[in-house]
Amino acid sequence: MKRSDLEKDAAYILDKFKQLDYEIPSNRQILKVIFYKLVVVYVFQLLFIIFDIFINSNVRDYHYFDTFVITLGSNAFFSLVFLMSTYNLVSLKISLGSEITEQSVLLKLVERKINSYGQFLMVVNAIVGCVLLSSGERFVAGLGFSWFVTYLISMITLQTSLSRYMTPAVVSSLSKVKELLSASPK
């Protein structure tokens, strides 16, 4: 991908967005997208806990309450970080709409990278879940902490991998789009 192509694409995004009479997304719309992604994490966690109960059912006293509390805490911690880090991006994507998103090479690239990092998170946490499952009773309850750590690592790696595409002109155009989104009426 050439620098000039990226800069033209970023300018295209800015020009189209200036012309767009976009609808400001509601919290409900934004949170719906975010929690749709989080449901996958919760289902993963639930499946591993069910497997843990079946595998460790021969243990005299399975500690259901302890498992529930640890699971709730670890997933709440991850969910909070995930929510805070994705809220603005989801708002931007909804505001840009499908026309701009589908036409932009840069936005398609970012979306592809995010999807591949999402798949990476799924695979790594499935492996971690299996390791925790084989470690013994209730260890799988801490899988939310694994999601947190792998998410942070993935976000840092994603930002690093995208940084080579962020020329000064691209950053300037994207900053102007963000300014347009957050500008308050005078």
From Swiss-Prot:
Name of the molecule in the record: Protein TraS
Protein's job: Involved in surface exclusion.
Keywords of this entry: Conjugation, Plasmid
